[in-house]
Amino acid sequence: MGEVRTEVNLTNAIDQGLVRRGQLAPDQVRRYKADALVDTGAVRMVVPPHVVQALGLAITGERLAEYADGRKDIVGMTEPIDIVIQGRSTFDEALVLGDEVIVGQTVLEKLDLWVDCNSRRLIPNPAHPDQPVSKVK
């Protein structure tokens, strides 16, 4: 089994809100496109510092991150990011570390996407191929 990567479009969610309120021109919204690693072992989304800077995101807090090798580190947490993968959109904060964008479990669950290990790609949940479904019970 090899790694799974996907195109992800990230947008500053605060910028989007300012556009909706007429306080920012649409062409001023900060966006970033990445070839992201999909990691089902990562719970949260991860963005590196250069992406935080490109999107103009504020660091709103800190979280304790535990790496696969057992090391732990305090890392920054961003304000909300609009995340679009395969036309499906959600909002989430991200941990700030490393040098590449990583899509973790929470984003996959919110977007109702599955990892197809055989073909090394993301696929929509076969039960909900047209749009994500969020369980509320």
Q: Which residues are covered by each model-predicted region?
A:
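Pepsin/retropepsin-fold aspartyl endopeptidases
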Residues: 1-137
